[in-house]
């Protein structure tokens, strides 16, 4: 692989080269010979090379068109690998055949919208093993009552079981990012953690609750324009005190709250 390619700052590129961490990512994803792996952002192909040796099939989505011919030259095109010039935020994941494991070293500036997109198409995935900015990984895995617990925590934990696998220092990358990174695995749940009457309304409630996280639920949820009588019944009907703040509610409590307010 040509090592003279310079990382594009505009694409948030930081190329992971350290074979120790590349192997650990594949281990964390539990990539085996029967697995189809979707790699987002193969970059210079260092992780791709590890995945191709382990997986049945690797589909690599790369936004940087400079890298496509280099990746194709390195790996060729065959039954075991396909390299596409594609934007992970626009890709039609619904068109994927069967189930896939996602493995990705995500550009940090778009990691949250990509996670949301992948979660929206979770039916296509067994798991997501993602290299993220450490603080985002911590946020995803945080329990209720923690300062890092927020909308993304609830959304991910509703549909997946997150686990922080390990931290990766800046010097494992070229160029070095200014922050620590962490690999997190999200194992997609067969069913959401909570049975919901209306998943879209649940998401609206959680977004509203965390949009003003210093305020009580009573004040933060006013934007939903639920009638006052129903708001007064929340405590007696759900056991949830609207004097609490969003960060104290579990996913299950958000489910009860949303189902009642939306009924």
Map each language-model feature to its residues.
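Catalytic cores of RNA-modifying enzymes
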Residues: 1-207, 236, 247, 256-263
């Amino acid at each position: 692989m040509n090592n003279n390619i310079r990382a594009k700052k505009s694409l948030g590129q930081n190329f992971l080269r350290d074979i120790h961490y590349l192997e650990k990512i594949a281990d964390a994803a539990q990539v085996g010979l029967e697995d189809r792996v979707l790699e987002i952002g193969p970059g210079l192909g260092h992780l791709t090379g590890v995945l191709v040796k382990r997986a049945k099939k690797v589909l690599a989505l790369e936004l940087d068109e400079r890298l496509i011919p280099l990746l194709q030259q390195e790996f060729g095109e065959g039954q075991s690998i396909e390299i596409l010039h594609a934007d992970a935020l626009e890709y039609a994941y619904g068109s994927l055949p069967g189930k896939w494991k996602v493995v990705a070293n995500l550009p940090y500036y778009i990691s949250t919208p990509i996670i949301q997109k992948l979660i929206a198409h979770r039916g296509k995935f067994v798991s997501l093993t993602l290299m993220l900015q450490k603080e985002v990984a911590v946020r995803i895995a945080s329990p209720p009552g923690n300062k890092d617990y927020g909308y993304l925590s609830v959304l991910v934990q509703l549909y997946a079981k997150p686990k922080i696998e390990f931290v990766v220092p800046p010097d494992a990358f070229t160029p070095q990012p200014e922050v620590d990174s962490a690999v997190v695995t999200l194992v997609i749940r067969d069913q959401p953690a909570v049975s919901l009457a209306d998943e879209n309304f649940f998401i609206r409630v959680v977004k509203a609750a965390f949009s003003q996280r210093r305020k009580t639920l009573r004040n933060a949820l006013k934007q939903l324009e639920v009638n006052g009588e129903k708001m007064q019944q929340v405590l007696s009907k759900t056991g949830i005190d609207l004097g609490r703040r969003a960060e104290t509610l579990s996913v299950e409590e958000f489910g009860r709250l949303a189902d009642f307010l939306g009924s």
